């Protein structure tokens, strides 16, 4: 993890609600909701192609690695993941698409600039951070996309998701990275970590490697 990300806390539900209420357009609200419910990286969120990456029947959204996105947004790892959003959020997503359809239909990115000289252009990462800075000035609450990602991890942990499932949903290559996302260090996490490493050390025959070198 980057140094600035190591000590980042998870956003709280009441903070997210306050930020959502302070938003002046539904695009920003949908972006925040999807990041909170999917746990995707902001580059992955901005890379969503509404013509290919959204399963409108099953309310699922796919992360697909592409290195040629116009807004330079891309998935971190070259792997596909899927996530499901709540029915209410998906309905709101459809509302957003309908609200800005005149602009959206001219290209394929889900999140675009909705005013100004760059209207209709894919939304960029720096524009998202500018939006969150405006929300901080307006509400006094500091929220970043990474904090929303950690919110996802912590709420799934509290809902008793297996550690490996959370790690997979976040797109982490290493379980240790997921553990650092969780704002807890309790017996439940300790037990889950021990069980994971016990099973995987047996899978790779680590004990045999050590035994052969003694």
Predicted segment positions?
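Basic, Lys/Arg- and aromatic-enriched nucleic-acid-binding interface segment
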Residues: 13-42
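Active-site/catalytic core of tyrosine-dependent DNA strand-transfer enzymes
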Residues: 86-141
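Flexible interdomain linker/hinge and immediately adjacent N-terminus
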Residues: 1-17, 114-119
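Short, basic (Lys/Arg/His-rich) helix/loop patches that form interaction surfaces
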Residues: 129-168
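The alpha-helix within a helix-turn-helix
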Residues: 35, 46, 167, 179
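Catalytic-site neighborhood detector that most strongly recognizes the C-terminal catalytic loop/helix
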Residues: 170, 174-195
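Conserved tyrosine-mediated DNA breakage-rejoining catalytic core shared by Y-recombinases
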Residues: 47-91
């Amino acid at each position: 993890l980057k140094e600035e990300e190591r000590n980042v806390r998870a956003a709280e539900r009441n903070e997210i609600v306050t930020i959502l209420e302070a938003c002046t357009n539904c695009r920003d609200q949908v972006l925040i909701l999807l990041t909170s419910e999917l746990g995707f990286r902001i580059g992955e969120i901005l890379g969503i192609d509404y013509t290919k990456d959204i399963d409108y029947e099953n309310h699922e959204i796919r992360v697909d690695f592409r290195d040629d996105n116009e807004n330079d947004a891309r998935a971190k790892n070259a792997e596909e993941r899927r996530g499901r959003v709540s029915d209410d959020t998906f309905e709101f997503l459809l509302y957003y698409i309908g609200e800005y359809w005149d602009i959206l239909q001219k290209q394929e990115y889900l999140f675009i600039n909705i005013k100004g000289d760059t209207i209709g252009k894919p939304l960029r990462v720096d524009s998202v951070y500018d939006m969150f800075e405006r929300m901080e000035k307006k509400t006094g609450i500091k929220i970043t996309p990474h904090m929303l990602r950690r919110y996802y991890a912590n709420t799934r942990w509290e809902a008793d998701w297996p550690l490996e499932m959370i790690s997979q949903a976040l797109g982490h290559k290493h379980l240790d990275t997921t553990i650092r996302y969780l704002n807890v260090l309790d017996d439940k996490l300790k037990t889950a970590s021990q069980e994971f490493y016990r099973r995987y050390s047996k899978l790779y025959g680590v004990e045999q490697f050590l035994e052969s070198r003694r």
